[in-house]
Amino acid sequence: MEKKVGTDRVKRGMAQMQKGGVIMDVVNAEQAKIAEEAGAVAVMALERVPSDIRAAGGVARMADPRIVEEVMNAVSIPVMAKARIGHITEARVLEAMGVDYIDESEVLTPADDEFHLLKSDFTVPFVCGCRDIGEALRRIGEGAAMLRTKGEPGTGNIVEAVRHMRQVNGQIRQIASMTDDELMVAAKNFGAPYELVKEIKTLGKLPVVNFAAGGVATPADAALMMELGADGVFVGSGIFKSDNPAKFASAIVQATTYYTDYELIGKLSKELGSPMKGIEMSRLNPEDRMQDRSF
């Protein structure tokens, strides 16, 4: 039987439809409905949010398919799910289940410490994390249709997401200012496919959307990432580890849409209750840094 794969154009077009929106992590149907009612453009179905994965330790794997199905049956918006880096079978199972996107995610324990999935070999579009333009273009070269900053998941600390967004956008500006004869050396230095470096030079931007993720915990955090050039926002632990998830979810969606309306963001931030408890980056041991799990 002939294998079907989706084209880059179709996959990237699907991801473009989420631009400007918020994608929320959920662990059951009830949370998925809260996210949908708050205005999320998609949900990420998983067994535990990143802060719980971090606290539990051990090996984090793909969610129980029952949870993914429960979420898919509960909402009408797109449903994403996470597979371990390099785990072909987890990704194929999720594709067979009919999820709308797969996140090849460093939040889960990598299954392969050398190879990422060849995402162009799948029909379903993939989202992947990146910290710099080299990682971004390598993932696109493998077939990713959507990117997100890695940040540092489960910390409620926005500093790493800010660092990664600034790094990627700064390197895009650097490439855009290069002469054509400098591009091959740039590709070598970034460890990136030459043709994609050339495309960055032509477009002046990434050929796929790049969302912010990893540490978004407040409406102001979401607005900040949009100010820095994010195409949208992923919120992991920040919603359902807060005192008032429904109110936090709605406020973050509105702050993402109206990210330059500072008066509105101030109003949205009033009386929300406590956000999730954050972690200072200096308190993380090197082996606990999820962002370092891919390459």
UniProtKB/Swiss-Prot annotation:
<feature type="binding site">
    <location>
        <position position="166"/>
    </location>
    <ligand>
        <name>D-glyceraldehyde 3-phosphate</name>
    </ligand>
</feature>
<dbReference type="GO" id="GO:0042823">
    <property type="term" value="P:pyridoxal phosphate biosynthetic process"/>
</dbReference>
<dbReference type="GO" id="GO:0008615">
    <property type="term" value="P:pyridoxine biosynthetic process"/>
</dbReference>
<feature type="active site" description="Schiff-base intermediate with D-ribose 5-phosphate">
    <location>
        <position position="82"/>
    </location>
</feature>
<protein>
    <recommendedName>
        <fullName>Pyridoxal 5'-phosphate synthase subunit PdxS</fullName>
        <ecNumber>4.3.3.6</ecNumber>
    </recommendedName>
</protein>
<comment type="subunit">
    <text>In the presence of PdxT, forms a dodecamer of heterodimers.</text>
</comment>
<dbReference type="Pfam" id="PF01680">
    <property type="entry name" value="SOR_SNZ"/>
</dbReference>
<comment type="function">
    <text>Catalyzes the formation of pyridoxal 5'-phosphate from ribose 5-phosphate (RBP), glyceraldehyde 3-phosphate (G3P) and ammonia. The ammonia is provided by the PdxT subunit. Can also use ribulose 5-phosphate and dihydroxyacetone phosphate as substrates, resulting from enzyme-catalyzed isomerization of RBP and G3P, respectively.</text>
</comment>
<comment type="pathway">
    <text>Cofactor biosynthesis; pyridoxal 5'-phosphate biosynthesis.</text>
</comment>
<keyword id="KW-0663">Pyridoxal phosphate</keyword>
<comment type="similarity">
    <text>Belongs to the PdxS/SNZ family.</text>
</comment>
<dbReference type="InterPro" id="IPR033755">
    <property type="entry name" value="PdxS/SNZ_N"/>
</dbReference>
<feature type="binding site">
    <location>
        <position position="215"/>
    </location>
    <ligand>
        <name>D-ribose 5-phosphate</name>
    </ligand>
</feature>
<keyword id="KW-0456">Lyase</keyword>
<dbReference type="InterPro" id="IPR001852">
    <property type="entry name" value="PdxS/SNZ"/>
</dbReference>
<dbReference type="GO" id="GO:0036381">
    <property type="term" value="F:pyridoxal 5'-phosphate synthase (glutamine hydrolysing) activity"/>
</dbReference>
<dbReference type="InterPro" id="IPR011060">
    <property type="entry name" value="RibuloseP-bd_barrel"/>
</dbReference>
<feature type="binding site">
    <location>
        <begin position="236"/>
        <end position="237"/>
    </location>
    <ligand>
        <name>D-ribose 5-phosphate</name>
    </ligand>
</feature>
<dbReference type="GO" id="GO:0006520">
    <property type="term" value="P:amino acid metabolic process"/>
</dbReference>
<dbReference type="InterPro" id="IPR013785">
    <property type="entry name" value="Aldolase_TIM"/>
</dbReference>
<feature type="binding site">
    <location>
        <position position="25"/>
    </location>
    <ligand>
        <name>D-ribose 5-phosphate</name>
    </ligand>
</feature>
<feature type="binding site">
    <location>
        <position position="154"/>
    </location>
    <ligand>
        <name>D-ribose 5-phosphate</name>
    </ligand>
</feature>
<keyword id="KW-0704">Schiff base</keyword>
